[in-house]
């Protein structure tokens, strides 16, 4: 029983030191936010937005017809972030690859710990 507690304590200390020593690169870079008054609004959307003087009790009239798109080519997507095959940003790939060894070591030691506890349980029977 004492060996099980000692093994648990050693494993906890080791895994804690691994997690504390690993670099924390999970920070999301802050992007510049644009307030609605600063951005340019397209003429198609402008009638749908309420003016600043409109109270919340008024409703915006809905249009029965949608404006026709200028470009008939639906497959052409002007924003690559919304493309179906868009890859994640390079910064997120770099942070994942830098954490891979620590995560692998963590799972190896967790597996060894579980196996040793199983052996202790079997030997106690």
Curated annotation (Swiss-Prot):
Pro-peptide positions on chain: 99-125
Stretches for region Disordered: 20-95
Keyword field: Cell membrane, Glycoprotein, GPI-anchor, Lipoprotein, Membrane, Proteoglycan, Signal
Ranges of biased composition (kind: Polar residues): 53-66
Signal peptide: 1-21
Modification after translation, per record: O-glycosylated on the hydroxyproline residues.
Main location: membrane
Name of the molecule in the record: Classical arabinogalactan protein 27
Described function: Proteoglycan that seems to be implicated in diverse developmental roles such as differentiation, cell-cell recognition, embryogenesis and programmed cell death.
Protein family membership: Belongs to the classical AGP family.
Bilayer topology term: Lipid-anchor; GPI-anchor
Residue positions bearing lipid (GPI-anchor amidated serine): 98
Ranges of compositional bias, category Low complexity: 20-36, 77-95
One GO cellular component, as annotated: plasma membrane
Protein localization: Cell membrane
Species classification: Eukaryota, Viridiplantae, Streptophyta, Embryophyta, Tracheophyta
